[in-house]
């Protein structure tokens, strides 16, 4: 239902075929401002999962983590740390990992101390029509295959879009990502990632950063006012 719903403990779901639906991205708000237990806001390990039309705010750790799941749809979901860009914010806003057939559509991610929208060690991914602001990394595709990132707005992050393949993770060999039709503007927020995080090395003012990933296509994006480099 609509309203601000105060939640003090992490939620989890491990039953497949579930839809969690609110009434709107700014109407149904799960607030974890007074969270006392757990790290994530919502942790999902389930197939055929849909979450839509709601917001998750001010979690201690990751807002929405989806682990080892297949057929995931994240539609019109907002994750936000409402006090602005702080190193004490949770690392990830929308965070599918080791998953497949993932759609993120019309999402909003604000204030993550690592990545607003992060898809890691996953395959067959679409991130589209979404907005990422005031994160260290706006959108990050890491150690993943067959990802399309298109028609998104990334602005006021440290780095707008990152495509990485990192060592020492269970799944290696990131490749076949397409980044197109995105608006990547003014990603000049000072890096506020905690010391030791990989993204702590991303320079403020980065539009798109690609590292150690193969078969990447970048086309028909609009870049502007990224003070270090539009493409790195």
Please give the residue ranges for each predicted region:
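Extracellular beta-strand/beta-solenoid scaffold signature
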Residues: 8, 33-43, 58-65, 86-96, ...
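Extracellular beta-rich repeat passengers
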Residues: 66, 76, 106, 151-153, ...
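Right-handed parallel beta-helix/beta-spiral solenoid domain characteristic of secreted/periplasmic
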Residues: 5-7, 17-60
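Short, intrinsically disordered, charge-balanced linker/junction segments flanking boundaries
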Residues: 1-4, 230-232
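Solvent-exposed coil/turn segments that connect beta secondary-structure elements
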Residues: 3, 16, 23-25, 35, ...
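All-beta strand scaffolds that present successive hydrophobic residues in beta-strands
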Residues: 15, 19-22, 46-52, 72-75, ...
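Extended, compositionally simple hydrophobic/Ser/Thr-rich segments
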Residues: 72-77, 84-85, 101-107, 115-118, ...
């Amino acid at each position: 239902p609509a309203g601000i719903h105060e939640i003090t403990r992490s939620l989890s779901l491990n039953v497949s075929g579930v839809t969690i639906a609110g009434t709107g991205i700014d109407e149904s708000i799960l607030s974890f401002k007074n969270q006392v237990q757990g790290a994530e806001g919502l942790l999902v390990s389930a197939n055929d999962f849909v979450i839509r039309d709601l917001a998750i705010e001010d979690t201690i750790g990751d807002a929405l983590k989806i682990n080892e799941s297949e057929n995931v749809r994240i539609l019109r979901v907002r994750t936000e740390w409402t006090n602005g860009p702080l190193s004490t914010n949770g690392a990830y806003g929308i965070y599918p990992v080791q998953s497949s057939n993932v759609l993120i559509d019309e999402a909003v991610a604000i204030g993550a101390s690592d990545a607003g929208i992060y898809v890691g060690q996953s395959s067959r991914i679409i991130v589209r029509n979404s907005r990422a602001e005031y994160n260290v990394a706006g959108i990050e595709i890491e150690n993943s295959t067959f990802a399309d990132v298109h028609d998104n707005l990334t602005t006021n992050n440290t780095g707008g879009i990152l495509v990485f393949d990192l060592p020492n993770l269970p799944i290696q060999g990131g490749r076949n990502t397409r980044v197109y039709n995105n608006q990547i503007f003014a990603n000049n927020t000072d890096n506020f990632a905690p010391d030791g995080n990989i993204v702590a090395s991303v320079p403020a003012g980065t539009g798109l950063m690609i590292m150690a990933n193969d078969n990447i296509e970048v086309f028909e994006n609009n870049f502007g006012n990224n003070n270090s480099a539009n493409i790195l």
